[in-house]
């Protein structure tokens, strides 16, 4: 007794925890579940504690009732749902093969499933009847690993028989990815017409051009030899031709097709597509399902800009962040403008580059404007602005594009011009109350917002809002910091003001502070600051994340190729794939690009020296600063 009292004295614990300790702790073993499985498997291997016998195809399989009930809905309903099997020592299982039942029980006891071509079908049948989603998923994955042109119809039948929508979608994806080759097989013509119609209507159909869709539609009804020899009748066109997006075909191909057709509905359709090509100026206003790109790849894209090395070079390169590779690639279209700091807008998946700087020899503002069409990789020069605008901002509101203020290197501007794609014309709308340049703008909830900038030599922190319905400007609360040559982005009901520079310290410095304006509360706040300086950056928003591309760092005294991505949910910045060159004045946007472009080998990628990557040094030479003098920032 004395020893017990001594032990109690020794082991006495405090009844009241101190403030620095929590009352309870919960511990979780990472090995418990595997140990439990090993224990259950040992019981099965030793034949211990079996309490039910499954009778399958006349053969007996002993098992543990509680484990079966815990493993799937079928056995849970049988053994815990008030059915007669609750009291039976032997339970008859119908519709399942003995081998498949052994496979499934092995999975229940071990979490392992061995599949082969000889057992996958009966295992899938059993898993569907016994309602075991994991095994169904494994069987579908195994089948997809063996799918080819010869057996795909059989797998489709299995998917239909057991209502396996996920497997059907995987089979559809297989055909969409291999359409050109598959459309030349006999199995293609054995698919139901409705299935082929659905596949040919998909934006995920992987073709290099729309002509391959046209040929694929014909190959469902005619042999390859008949199509190649033009031994087909199109007076009553096959229904599948409804899925062909004729305006996406090249005009020369359409003209040849039109010339050989007699009077027919198809000829009228082709004539409409030819008219689309001839009315190039009106194409953005003629968009519909027939002109939609067969792609779901939305990419961050950058146009133009100015490099620092080997000399000050205005870029005519367009670059995009390839979502498949996670790296930047170049694509070059003929007649691409060689500019920097252009205003940029996207309307109906056309890119508009508005005004900007052409500062190769001295300062020169631009009034010229261009439009890029990713459907045909083609540039088109649209109507010029009514006056030159450098260091402007450009926004889309509704069906119009607005070019706001800027400067012409003689005067600061307050003028605002509005572009109507339907008439290819610019008109003046209500000007700003005061001149501003090097500002930034974005659109939110049908209104246009601009922030900060410069007026003369002064840096601003002003905020203005334009209401197109009343054609009026309203002044909002000032932002928290002066800045210019920055960027703006809109997410949810918030405006983000990012990057730029000011001279609050008495000399030009980067602004790392990121300001956020709530259109609901009409108040400013600050979010996570930029990890590096970005003056004259490209800005784009994709998947609720803000991309900040390149620009100038006055703290470093150089242009940069950095890419930083802001995650609003986490309020943090991440490093993105770095640009191939140090560049400022990049005009950035988000654009749907053709699948064929993303799968092409890169061509025409400029071979710039490695010195460009190392250009972000803290100290610059006199010649470097002379190069900087040709930038938009002064």
UniProtKB/Swiss-Prot annotation:
PROSITE patterns: BTB. Pathway: Protein modification; protein ubiquitination. It comes from the Eukaryota. InterPro entries: BACK (IPR011705), BTB-kelch_protein (IPR017096), BTB/POZ_dom (IPR000210), Kelch-typ_b-propeller (IPR015915), Kelch_1 (IPR006652), KLHL22_BACK (IPR030575), SKP1/BTB/POZ_sf (IPR011333). The modification Phosphotyrosine is found at residue 466. Its main location: cytoplasm. One of its GO terms (molecular function) is ubiquitin-like ligase-substrate adaptor activity. Kelch repeats lie at residues 299-349, 350-399, 400-446, 448-493, 495-544, 545-593. It holds the Pfam family Kelch_1. The keyword Phosphoprotein applies. Residues 600-634 are annotated as: Disordered. It is found in: Cytoplasm, Cytosol; Cytoplasm, Cytoskeleton, Microtubule organizing center, Centrosome; Cytoplasm, Cytoskeleton, Spindle; Nucleus. GO terms for biological process: cell division; cellular response to amino acid stimulus; cellular response to L-leucine; mitotic sister chromatid segregation; mitotic spindle assembly checkpoint signaling; negative regulation of autophagy; negative regulation of type I interferon production; positive regulation of cell growth. The modification Phosphothreonine is found at residues 463, 475, 605. The modification N-acetylalanine is found at residue 2. Transmembrane segments: none annotated. Residues 624-634 have a biased composition (Acidic residues). One of its GO terms (cellular component) is Cul3-RING ubiquitin ligase complex. Keywords: Acetylation, Cell cycle, Cell division, Cytoplasm, Cytoskeleton, Kelch repeat, Lysosome, Mitosis, Nucleus, Phosphoprotein, Repeat, Ubl conjugation pathway. Residues 50-117 form the BTB domain. Component of the BCR(KLHL22) E3 ubiquitin ligase complex, at least composed of CUL3, KLHL22 and RBX1. Interacts with PLK1. Interacts with DEPDC5 (via DEP domain); the interaction depends on amino acid availability. Interacts with YWHAE; required for the nuclear localization of KLHL22 upon amino acid starvation. Substrate-specific adapter of a BCR (BTB-CUL3-RBX1) E3 ubiquitin ligase complex required for chromosome alignment and localization of PLK1 at kinetochores. The BCR(KLHL22) ubiquitin ligase complex mediates monoubiquitination of PLK1, leading to PLK1 dissociation from phosphoreceptor proteins and subsequent removal from kinetochores, allowing silencing of the spindle assembly checkpoint (SAC) and chromosome segregation. Monoubiquitination of PLK1 does not lead to PLK1 degradation. This is Kelch-like protein 22. It comes from Mus musculus (Mouse).
